[in-house]
Amino acid sequence: MARALLIVLDSVGIGGAPDADRYGDAGSDTVGHIAEACAAGRGDRPGLRAGPLRMPNLTALGLGLACEGATGRVPPGLAPDGPVRALWGHAVETAAGKDTPSGHWEIAGVPVREAWGHFPDTQPAFPAELTAALIERAGLPGILGDCHASGTAIIEALGAEHVRTGKPICYTSADSVFQIAAHEEAFGLERLYETCRIAREVCDPYRVGRVIARPFLGSAAEGFRRTSHRKDFSVAPPAGTLLDGLEAAGRAVVSVGKIGDIFAHRATGREIKPAGNAACLDAALDAFAGLPEGGFVFLNLVDFDTEHGHRRDVPGYAAELEAFDARLPEIQAVLKPGDLCVITADHGNDPTWTGTEHTREQVPVLAFGPGLTPRALGRRESFADMGASVAAHLGLPPLGAGQAW
């Protein structure tokens, strides 16, 4: 019986989706623009990296050709040198969102058919009755923010007032999110989580996809900094996912990174949530090495998105891509005959783009394992094709959406 490892490189899009113009994202291209910036010397940072984008292992798996399929061009430095060693293609999202739950749920076989609720880019951004209910139920002295904002910018602007008043910082973005930032010591980490649990209930009637706890530390004098104790409070998928199918079949499942949060901890098996891409990949490889036949490891690597995409940090994003690429031999080494590894993304977050939000993009589809014959997969009309293919590989019944390759 086979095993499978599904790796989501959070926000590593490869070119604007066919409907990107509806989102103001026509022309966005996370990987392509990073490669172009690095080739032009705009990806250099002393002590971090310099020169063209170097991803020899992903290039050998067909990443550059997947980019070409999505945009019509191979990004600088990503043309394969020799035969491609994987199945390669690109996928288009059918869900209306460009957010984390929409992308992951569709990958797992459940496209979001109804639109998420969003808050307007006004101040206040939140309905008065929502704010009043949260303040009353959580016993808060009030809230700060109540607007669209960059998470790092708003804690710098309001962190000192938050510590002084005890009012948490509440903000949103173009995604369907209600985010609450609070100081781990002055406000308390567990109190922040409990406030978010209440906010989750308060936000449900508004079809908000995620409530996110954004803890931070520091002071006005030394500056404030986010910690690794972020926690997402998501709604559950509206139908059975690949994970539910695995649970029903009695298969071993390991969820690494924020996968458990994304799927509201339903059918997510053993959850491991280290801090940072490197530690998450370590945990996934360790879990996969001991995984029984028929098992599944689902990994999200979020630092591309949170540390570099939203911060429009080209050198940091490039270095993160190169660091992952350097570890591909470790991934290949843990695969046994019959195993499948799929590498993809959930949306884009072009660090050369305007603003600080996600970008509506196509995503790479790279699949490999001992004994798999490399070939072009072309354009996949739904992210759900990946979940369908993993289900077929593991001998599960077909999912509700997607076509296996």
Curated annotation (Swiss-Prot):
Cofactor list: Mn(2+)
Q: What EC numbers are recorded for this enzyme? A: 5.4.2.7
Q: Name one GO molecular function term.
A: magnesium ion binding
Q: Which InterPro entries match?
A: Alkaline_phosphatase_core_sf, DeoB, Metalloenzyme, Phosphopentomutase_DeoB_cap_sf
Q: Which domain of life is it from?
A: Bacteria
Copy the pathway line from the protein's UniProt record: Carbohydrate degradation; 2-deoxy-D-ribose 1-phosphate degradation; D-glyceraldehyde 3-phosphate and acetaldehyde from 2-deoxy-alpha-D-ribose 1-phosphate: step 1/2
* Pfam families the record matches: Metalloenzyme
Question: What is its subcellular localisation?
Answer: Cytoplasm
The record lists the membrane-crossing segments as: none
GO biological process assignments = 2-deoxyribose 1-phosphate catabolic process; 5-phosphoribose 1-diphosphate biosynthetic process; metabolic compound salvage; nucleotide metabolic process
Q: Which residues bind Mn(2+) 2?
A: 305, 310, 358
- What does the cofactor field's note say? Binds 2 manganese ions.
Q: Which UniProt keywords apply?
A: Cytoplasm, Isomerase, Manganese, Metal-binding
**Reactions listed under catalytic activity:** 2-deoxy-alpha-D-ribose 1-phosphate = 2-deoxy-D-ribose 5-phosphate; alpha-D-ribose 1-phosphate = D-ribose 5-phosphate
NCBIfam families (UniProt xref): deoB, PRK05362.1
> What does this protein's UniProt record list under function?
Isomerase that catalyzes the conversion of deoxy-ribose 1-phosphate (dRib-1-P) and ribose 1-phosphate (Rib-1-P) to deoxy-ribose 5-phosphate (dRib-5-P) and ribose 5-phosphate (Rib-5-P), respectively.
Query: Which HAMAP family does the record match to this protein?
Result: Phosphopentomut
Q: What is this protein called?
A: Phosphopentomutase
**Species in which this protein is naturally found:** Methylorubrum extorquens (strain CM4 / NCIMB 13688) (Methylobacterium extorquens)
Organism lineage reads as: Bacteria, Pseudomonadati, Pseudomonadota, Alphaproteobacteria, Hyphomicrobiales
